[in-house]
Regions:
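Conserved Radical SAM active-site core
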Residues: 166-225, 238-343
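Conserved AdoMet/S-adenosylmethionine-binding subsite of the radical SAM
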Residues: 259-262, 266-269, 273, 282-429, ...
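Cysteine-centered iron-sulfur cluster-binding motifs in ferredoxin-type domains/subunits
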Residues: 227-235
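N-terminal chloroplast transit peptides
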Residues: 7-10, 14-47
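N-terminal, immediately post-signal peptide pro-regions of secreted/luminal proteins
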Residues: 32-70
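Short, charged/polar micro-motifs that form catalytic or ligand-binding hotspots
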Residues: 120-124, 212-213, 225, 251, ...
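Flexible, acidic/Gly-rich N-terminal and inter-domain linker regions that tether
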Residues: 56-60, 67-217
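C-terminal accessory extensions appended to soluble enzyme cores
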Residues: 429-481
Length: 481
């Protein structure tokens, strides 16, 4: 007989499969009596018929109940300080959009309803999560302009991010109404999307089973993926670490043992930097952060570790984390202690893709709070088609960052993973865009390096274009090996 734990695990797996199907099995009611169903790559309206609750409806209710606990656990890692929903996911996006759908009429109503089902289908493959702050403050919700809104495109997945073959594979599996077939199709598509590029899982990792959440590719820098920080306030559609968020431990980096992590640092005196990444380390409460980093308040502890970097989007996706969340002051006090008592450099590696992210007083207040704690903020972002592939956007972004005391750091190129084909920009165009943006910028903004790309051997920068033997060629150099 199987143990209770194993039975529970099997039941949970089955219910999650049912939940997958439940999210997309029922046609979407348009609030006015009609329904909308996805057919191929388009949508159509249909007649609405009421009927007694079916077994499928019951399955949907059971599935929704089974995943409710997981949703609550996921968002409980930091205290909410704002609206009803701290995060919008595929499970509650319909509730969030209901007000906008109800307030719309005619074609606008239809477009919003179509978008909702498109999001729910795409989110079966790509992780979807968006903070209520972003939904309320950074997105223009005019249905006519959504496709042109950079923040909407940055955060809301669409089936168009998949190849036509993968779209059809997903739609066929969904149409079968078999949750096992749908789960298998989703897993196969994700595998085709190269979930951990450039040897992320096989290279530059210690062999110890106690060190499953660190990478040591460059001599001076160790990456830490704390297990409790492997989620974000919002998931970027282009995120190259999307595999961290799909619930598959086989492709996930996560460090649970803080003692083993600190021991590793002590065994490697060549290290000077630790980059805490994920996910987002600022999704964690301060107590969890301290379990990994608290000892660095003591200047005699591992003195060769001089720089603590935090890879984060919290600054513009949930700025309340540094201003009004329940433990915001405790977090800032801890960062300040690392600087003033521990003698460490605390660097916030802020992922900022568009100048609109820095347009709110909430973001500016968060910037000032971090700076007052002694942290240095540096900005970086990939260049992505339809989001920020415009020299004027980059020039405005860098100008605003310099105004706020943020140091422009990197312009990256899309990595070979996820929806790379949907978002990538040709190398020649990326180089020209960088040059055009730099020309519009003052010397203070010219700290930004790029366009650069990470690959298996190291980090490469496109330095220029030259004529070699009568042909144009890119001039590149390694920034790190």
């Amino acid at each position: 007989m199987a143990s209770p734990g194993k039975c529970s695990g099997k039941r949970s797996a089955v219910l999650r499969r049912l939940a997958l199907l439940a999210l997309v099995a029922a046609p979407l009611t348009d609030r006015a009596g009609g329904t909308f169903s996805l057919v191929g790559r388009g949508f159509h309206g249909g007649d609405h018929h009421t009927s007694p609750k079916s077994s499928k409806a019951h399955i949907r209710e059971v599935a929704a109940a089974s995943i409710a606990g997981a949703v609550l656990e996921d968002v409980a890692v930091a205290a909410p300080a704002m609206e009803k929903f701290r995060a919008i996911t595929s499970k509650n996006v319909e509730s969030f959009l209901k007000e906008r759908i109800d307030a719309s009429t005619g074609e606008k109503k239809l477009k919003l309803a179509q978008r909702l089902q498109d999001i729910q289908l795409a989110a079966l493959v790509f992780p979807f999560r968006c903070s209520s702050y972003v939904m309320e403050h950074l997105i223009n919700w005019d249905p006519e302009d959504l496709d042109q809104d950079p923040m909407y495109r940055l955060l809301f997945p669409t089936l168009q991010m998949l190849s036509r073959r993968h779209q059809q594979q997903l739609l066929d599996a969904r149409a079968s109404e078999d949750p096992f077939a749908l789960e298998a199709a989703v897993k196969a598509i994700r595998s085709d999307l190269n979930p951990q590029p450039a040897g992320q899982l096989t290279l530059n990792r210690p062999k110890s089973a106690a060190l499953q959440g660190i990478q040591h590719k460059y001599a001076e820098t160790c990456l830490l993926f704390p297990s409790a920080g492997q989620t974000c306030h919002a998931y970027c559609t282009y995120c190259f670490r999307w595999a961290q968020f799909i619930g598959d431990d086989d492709v996930r980096l996560a460090q649970k043992d803080s003692v083993a992590f600190l021991r590793y640092l002590g065994e490697h005196p060549e290290l000077s930097d630790v980059l805490i990444t994920g996910g987002d380390p600022f999704i964690m409460r301060v107590g969890l952060l301290k379990s990994y980093l608290g000892k660095f308040v003591d200047p005699s502890f591992l003195p060769h570790i001089q720089n603590l970097r935090f890879g984060t989007r919290t600054l513009t996706f949930w700025p309340q984390r540094f201003t009004s969340d329940q433990d915001a002051h405790e977090l800032l006090d801890f960062l300040q202690q690392l600087v003033e008592v521990g003698g460490r450099s605390v660097d916030i590696m802020a992922h900022i893709s568009h100048d609109v992210e820095l347009s709110t007083p909430h973001a500016e207040k968060a910037v000032r709070a971090l700076q007052a704690a002694g942290a240095t903020i540096r900005s970086q972002s990939p260049i992505m088609k339809g989001i920020n592939d415009d020299a004027d956007v980059w020039a405005r972004k860098w100008k605003r960052e310099v105004q706020l005391g943020i140091i422009p750091y990197y312009m990256f190129l899309a990595r070979d993973t996820g929806a790379q084909d949907y978002f990538s920009v040709p190398l020649a165009r990326a180089h020209q865009l960088y040059a055009d943006a730099i020309r519009q910028s003052s010397g203070l903004a010219r700290t930004a390096r790029g366009p650069s790309m990470s690959c298996t051997p190291g980090k490469v920068e496109i330095s220029g274009i030259e004529i070699v033997n009568g042909q144009k060629a890119f001039v590149m150099r390694f920034l790190q090996l």
